[in-house]
Amino acid sequence: MKLKEKMTQEIKALEQKKADADVAKKELMKIQVLSSRFTMEPEQDGKPQPVIRLVVKNNTDTVISRAYLHGVMASEGYSVPWLVSNFFYDIPEGLKPNEEATWAIAPPKNSEWGVLYAPKDAVLTVTPVRVDGTDNQALYDATMFTEEDNSRLEELKKKNL
């Protein structure tokens, strides 16, 4: 196979991967995070427990068994967020279509959440980036097309002109 053909095939594969990720992003918008809040709750051992509280609604037509989430804790007026973190939540019994649920996620005390001391005015924004179905396989995955994929696609397009 010639180099030009190989490059063309790789471009097509990367463009398809990008298109699939774009479809996933659109579908993931149907998973609404209605509210998100971060607190440090007192514990008997003296070290507070970080807790991420979310109210989530599933507006898809499929049961979701696990949600992969992207969280950003930031304050207005600051250009750098206090924390940017990816995390997941296994949903007991799944989140059914049109169902709304409140989740209390308790990250480990020694995680980045456990050492986070953001001011009271900091706001937690949470975005779903992938959800799995009851078969534990990805239903929608916006993370499949990476920055590296995008750079490679741009590089190949320049070379293939």
List each model region and its residues.
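Short, solvent-exposed, Trp/other aromatic-anchored flexible loops in extracytoplasmic proteins
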Residues: 83-156, 161
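Low-complexity, acidic Ser/Thr/Pro/Gly-rich terminal tails and inter-domain linkers that flank the onset
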Residues: 3-53, 144-160
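Asparagine-centered strand-capping/turn motif at beta-strand->loop junctions
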Residues: 55-60
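Short acidic, flexible loop segments centered on an aromatic residue
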Residues: 63-78
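Generic short beta-strand segments
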Residues: 37-38, 69-72, 108
